[in-house]
Regions:
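Basic, amphipathic alpha-helical segments enriched in Lys/Arg and hydrophobic/aromatic residues
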Residues: 114-174
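Short secondary-structure boundary micro-motifs
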Residues: 1-3, 39, 44, 102, ...
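Intrinsically disordered and other compositionally biased segments
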Residues: 10, 97-102, 156, 167, ...
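Short, Lys/Arg-enriched charge-dense amphipathic segments
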Residues: 7-9, 78-84, 107, 165-174
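Polybasic low-complexity intrinsically disordered regions
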Residues: 1-83, 88, 136, 154-159
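Helix-centered, glycine/charged polyanion-binding patches within enzymatic domains
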Residues: 65-136
Length: 174
């Protein structure tokens, strides 16, 4: 809040990406305003998928029951780190099936947070960070258009071009 009322220009856009971990191609993208929670575009992005999704890697902000429900309905295994103060919902003596979030909490308790991330392969999520870095390096961090619908088109075109660059060839590391 500013001294003289609300800021008029302090807004930003969030680009949500879904990456195929094998090919490193962007398979879905969604541009939202800054007041949309990160879990909101996930169902729509999953609906865009033509190939089945086996695992979903996400950062800690996606640790919500809505997301777990969405992934469970589609039969997708979530790999999302629980919040540090997370508690078990179903304990070991329950006859109900185990919840993926509870398993993540148990894993963090047993192996430590870093150990759990290594065990479940959570660091594959960094492929998305790499794609975002490549996108910003090639096209810059700003959008040219002013209207949201035009910015959505612009971001979609940028992702298509980046996919084309990816198909041409990625650097090989040894």
């Amino acid at each position: 809040m500013r001294t003289h009322g609300k800021s008029k220009r302090r807004t930003w856009r969030k680009l949500h990406l879904m990456i195929n971990a094998e090919t490193q191609e962007i398979v879905a993208e969604c541009l939202t305003t800054n007041n949309v929670h990160d879990t909101v575009p996930v169902p729509g992005m999953l609906d865009e998928q033509k190939t089945p999704v086996g695992r979903f890697y996400g950062d800690g902000i996606l640790d919500t029951w809505d997301l777990y429900g969405t992934l469970d309905q589609r039969g997708i295994e979530p790999v999302v780190p629980p919040q540090r103060n997370a508690v078990l919902t179903r304990h070991g003596n329950s006859k109900l099936p185990k919840l993926p979030r509870d398993e993540a909490i148990r894993g963090c308790r047993k192996f430590g947070r870093k150990g759990w991330k290594v065990k479940v392969g959570y660091h594959r999520r960094s492929i998305v960070e790499t794609a975002m870095f490549r996108l910003k390096t090639i096209f810059g961090g700003r959008l040219k258009n002013r209207l949201l619908r035009n910015q959505k088109t612009e971001s979609r075109i940028r992702c298509k071009i980046l996919n084309h660059f990816t198909k041409l060839g990625m650097p090989k590391y040894e």
